């Protein structure tokens, strides 16, 4: 979406409470994650050419700093960094509302698969839909996320599991980057499951991805990262190592879906391979927690998925106390979690996962940024970083968990532009 210099210059004044989350790397453990660095008002933020030029006490703003800026009065309001959703399956075809009803009726995952549901259903729909159809659906989700204060979104492929459709999904992400305000981080996840053409032959499928799909993804510059579903019955450690090593050699960062269904040593492998993040972690072992705590790999937890599946939540409190850097993501997808609700993430993290509201804020800002390798440019409010902010309807960040389930966003600011206002 085109910007002019003027629209990217913004002076936010009279802020009741400014939450900066300052830092340029992931925050590990209870003490660091609990420090969100607030400035009580009146505070101000000045954004010039889309970049934060000042964040602090309003009395310290030099008049020359605000020349040519649009003014936004934040009297009685709290301002935070824009939220980073670091785990989504944004681009997909079709929906699985019938499958959700089957789950409510008690059907098992295997019985749903036998009825034609599960990931195979989404794969068939994604393969058949046009890029325009996929784009329209993804754009709608991004619009809803923007209204909840999200300013950066990670978006995976993985519902094609063949060359044509994986590239199609990633082209949709690329095109949407130019057609709407939010920043997108593109992840190639051809190894979401074994394609039906390779049923029972996961190692051969990984070789196909490494030999034919990954090189084309890289040649067309369609992804920054590569992800894989490492799980018993899906892809094992050897297959994961092969896929992610090939991706790293091709210049991509790497991530893993790990320890979601059973303890499988995924967290330990993610730390060993230098993954940006290990995600899900509902069944992480004590050894896995220790490995992540001693590494730079972010533990990205997805509470809405556990909620939707009526499963136990990831042990966030235990992980934070052990020294892990925890991020939160939505896991938006048409099957296990058809939601990207920021209010629900805050509620579940604080009420059911043992996190403080400060830790949840850290997890959705600077640690979310670290989970996609962008903590040096987003995730906090400080000079030199992108002007990505959320203005709440209330004077304190504590309302994010206290007034649970409600969208409290008054304005979303992306690169100095007000891209959403609650009217």
From Swiss-Prot:
Binding site residues for Zn(2+): 87, 89, 257, 331
Subcellular location(s) of the protein: Cytoplasm
UniProt: N-formimidoyl-L-glutamate binding residues: 159, 333, 335
Annotated InterPro entries: Amidohydro-rel, HutI, Metal-dep_hydrolase_composite, Metal_Hydrolase
Ranges that cross the membrane: none
Binding site for Fe(3+): 87, 89, 257, 331
Single GO cellular component term: cytoplasm
Enzyme Commission number, as recorded: 3.5.2.7
HAMAP family, sorted: HutI (MF_00372)
Protein's UniProt name: Imidazolonepropionase
Gene name linked to the record: hutI
